[in-house]
Amino acid sequence: MMLHAQHMPGQPGTPSLVFLHGFSGDCHEWQPVGEQFHGCSRLYIDLPGHGGSAAIPVDGFADVIRLLRATLISYNILKFWLVGYSLGGRVAMMAACQGIPGLCGLVVEGGHPGLQNEQARAERRLSDGRWAERFRHEPLTEVFHDWYQQPVFASLTAQQRQALTALRSQNNGETLAAMLEATSLAVQPDLREALNALAFPFYYLCGERDSKFRALAQEVAATCHVIRNAGHNAHRENPAGVVDSLAQILRL
């Protein structure tokens, strides 16, 4: 089994860019950024529970990474950079720490390296469980209205929140809930030590108004790029800034 994806070919001999979206996003999320790198092969993946992969069930990160590997093989992608946002960033970090073959470099935007104690994990398990129940049983417009009131999204304007709520409400609440539980921070290990031992380039992107993830970026051995005029979802709020950072990282 493989994940649904959109593949855009590039010039032979260049590493592929593999983009992983955030929770409730899909393969289109990264395209305004990725399509600026038309010289590279680009693969935009729908994670399980999302988009064209909505019907694919997983029990945890191991299943997600196995599907990711199968998808890369199916597209004959042998050398690549992983670029992931939020949930996609956490999947990318997990894959990198487990030694996914062919990985040349890692770029994470606003991805959490992991909680560091059992109390924090227990609190997150309860929180994610409550959200999952809401995704299963309530209208998605109401759930996402509240979702985007969370402190991490404080930099969004009312108009941006409204647009995101309308966009994300096109998802399937049941499959979102299942993926939220399967890949909760409560079940993700603390990756800091493993990330600090990576043998390939690791870069971290965060919006200048995203104080939580700017602080987390200092806890991992990554070169940090702060994106101006952006909060947690930097590639949506300032795509040109993220393009500039990626161009520097990839030396394009």
Swiss-Prot record:
Gene Ontology MF annotations: 2-succinyl-6-hydroxy-2,4-cyclohexadiene-1-carboxylate synthase activity
Pathway: Quinol/quinone metabolism; 1,4-dihydroxy-2-naphthoate biosynthesis; 1,4-dihydroxy-2-naphthoate from chorismate: step 3/7; Quinol/quinone metabolism; menaquinone biosynthesis
EC number annotated for this UniProt entry: 4.2.99.20
InterPro entries: AB_hydrolase_1, AB_hydrolase_fold, SHCHC_synthase_MenH
GO biological process: menaquinone biosynthetic process
Classification via Pfam families: Abhydrolase_6 (PF12697)
Gene3D superfamilies tied to this protein: alpha/beta hydrolase
Reaction(s) this enzyme catalyzes, per UniProt: 5-enolpyruvoyl-6-hydroxy-2-succinyl-cyclohex-3-ene-1-carboxylate = (1R,6R)-6-hydroxy-2-succinyl-cyclohexa-2,4-diene-1-carboxylate + pyruvate
Keywords assigned by UniProt, alphabetized: Lyase, Menaquinone biosynthesis
Assembly description: Monomer.
Family: Belongs to the AB hydrolase superfamily. MenH family.
PANTHER family: 2-SUCCINYL-5-ENOLPYRUVYL-6-HYDROXY-3-CYCLOHEXENE-1-CARBOXYLATE SYNTHASE, PROTEIN PHYLLO, CHLOROPLASTIC
Function description: Catalyzes a proton abstraction reaction that results in 2,5-elimination of pyruvate from 2-succinyl-5-enolpyruvyl-6-hydroxy-3-cyclohexene-1-carboxylate (SEPHCHC) and the formation of 2-succinyl-6-hydroxy-2,4-cyclohexadiene-1-carboxylate (SHCHC).
Stated name of the protein: 2-succinyl-6-hydroxy-2,4-cyclohexadiene-1-carboxylate synthase
Species for this entry: Salmonella typhimurium (strain LT2 / SGSC1412 / ATCC 700720)
Lineage: Bacteria, Pseudomonadati, Pseudomonadota, Gammaproteobacteria, Enterobacterales
